[in-house]
Amino acid sequence: MGKKLLQQRAGRGNINFRNPGWLRVGKVRYPTITGHHIAKVVDILHNPGMTEPVAKVKLDTGIQFFIPAVQGLISGQKIEVGEGSPASLGNIVPAKDLPEGVYVSNVELHRGDGGRYARTAGSYAIVVGKSEGKVILRLPSGKIKEIDENALVTVGTVAGGGVLEKPLLKAGNNYWKYKVKATKWPDVRGVAMNVVSHPHGGGLHQSVSRSSTVARNTPPGRKVGHIAARRTGRRDRK
């Protein structure tokens, strides 16, 4: 009897396939606030499984929250949050108060969503213009996006840029990289498995050796390859 496929084991919701969210420092988002506040950066922390460091910030009201740390932000630094805050490094300001050309990160689409864009290490968005009730940004992907003028943003570029340029050098480092993520590693190809482990496995060569197209109603243990494909292979040049 054959073994269960990787996707079948993942579908059971075993602890090995669940998102290890308990390792994170907490929810990285803006709090729901109004008015102007003075805040202090309590600490700069590593968030397991994420590329960017996070800053633990405490408001003058006692509320604590986490945001992606921007380049140049230091522990103990005082920042300003909310309406009327200047567009200085590390400050959290409404988008309408920003001049054109400034670099921002952890961008909200609507006020109160906590931040949705430019949150990973080294990323930023650029203010390119303003329209009625909207602020126009260029996102890291190059896409032009309009956000609500009252949406909060952090002035500066997210720290940790270039983290992907550091080579892993050995498989052991890659092991620890994926251990804190909801990703199974290493990812073994079906043709490299034994015949008992995968429909494409077995033989003395790494080839499917049969049609890899399967029907839509194929049973789960055999439903791998090109599922309900209209066509496969290269297209003929016209």
Swiss-Prot record:
Compositional bias segments (type: Polar residues): 206-216
Listed Basic residues bias regions: 223-238
Keyword Ribosomal protein: yes
GO molecular function, one term: structural constituent of ribosome
Highest taxon above the source species: Archaea
Keyword Transcription regulation: no
Family: Belongs to the universal ribosomal protein uL2 family.
PANTHER family referenced in this protein's UniProt entry, alphabetically: LARGE RIBOSOMAL SUBUNIT PROTEIN UL2, RIBOSOMAL PROTEIN L2
Protein name from the UniProt record: Large ribosomal subunit protein uL2
Species assigned in the record: Metallosphaera sedula (strain ATCC 51363 / DSM 5348 / JCM 9185 / NBRC 15509 / TH2)
Taxonomic lineage from the root: Archaea, Thermoproteota, Thermoprotei, Sulfolobales, Sulfolobaceae
